[in-house]
Structure formats: structure tokens, C-alpha cells
């Protein structure tokens, strides 16, 4: 039996155990749901100089980030068709970012969504049908379902992702 068939069987078993027939979708935060640049833009000149090249380590940066264009509406649409989780990585050297990410999810995606937040540096350990991520780092490139590479020519924005995932021809 091919590895992909085994993975699909495992995913179905997990879905049955959870009593859902909806496909599982994981959605990254930074530069997918969250506009990371908006956080950088909110920093003081001192903070920009102090944390240049490692802005994710700046305390409080995640609390100031805005949603990516179309991200909130896309999440709402996908949530109707899929079993959605937020799968993100938080920097080890900025423990406050873990809390800020949780608060961001609650603020923009609703009170119940924070219970669907998973913070991990090993995204490949999560079983699901799709991972929407802008990078291949932290296990995204080894994800056993389909990696929807956000921000690429094929999936440049949320409209293209939602269109692809909700198409009848899938």
C-alpha cells in the first residue's frame, strides 16, 4: 500500500474518531492569516534597530499585527466546508508571542477559534488533508497532506485558495 493511501486512511480514521466527515485544513498565521509586515510597521525606530533581522523576537509585535487581505472572510468560508485549525510556529526567544498569537486568533477569528490554535515547530506531525502555509520550514514541506503554498503564483491570495478548496472538481 502506498504511503499516501496509508495517510489518507489514517486521516479518515481520525475524522471518524472526531465524528466529522469534513476534510481537515491547517492554516498558518504569519503571512497567511496575519500580515506580519503590519507588525513591523508598528515598531518604533529603536525596536526596528534593536531587532533588525529578527523582528519576531520583539516583545509585543504579534499583538499589533493586522489580518491579511481577505483572510477573515476566507477563514469563515473554509470553516463551513472544512474542519479548520490554525497551525503556527512561535519563536522560542519571544515567549510572549505565544500568548499574543492566541489573543490575535480570539480577536479576529472569534472566541471559539482559539481552541483550534496549535503552536508547533513540527507541522509535519499533524495529520490532515491540507496545510495552507507560505513556507516549507518547520515541517510544512514534509506535511503528508497537500501543502497549499500561499503567496506563490498558483495561490497568490485568499481568493485563489478558497476557489481551489471549494471547487466541485476536487
Curated annotation (Swiss-Prot):
Cofactor section: Mg(2+)
MF terms in GO: 5'-nucleotidase activity; metal ion binding
Alphabetically ordered keywords of this record: Hydrolase, Magnesium, Metal-binding
Stated family: Belongs to the 5'(3')-deoxyribonucleotidase family.
GO biological process, one term: pyrimidine deoxyribonucleotide catabolic process
Lineage: Viruses, Duplodnaviria, Heunggongvirae, Uroviricota, Caudoviricetes
Pfam families per record: NT5C
Active site: 28, 30
Record-listed E.C. numbers: 3.1.3.-
Function: Dephosphorylates the 5' and 2'(3')-phosphates of deoxyribonucleotides.
Native organism: Vibrio phage KVP40 (isolate Vibrio parahaemolyticus/Japan/Matsuzaki/1991) (KVP40)
Top EC class, one word: hydrolase
PANTHER family: 5'(3')-DEOXYRIBONUCLEOTIDASE
Annotated protein name in UniProt: Putative 5'(3')-deoxyribonucleotidase
Residues reported in the UniProt entry to bind Mg(2+): 28, 30, 134
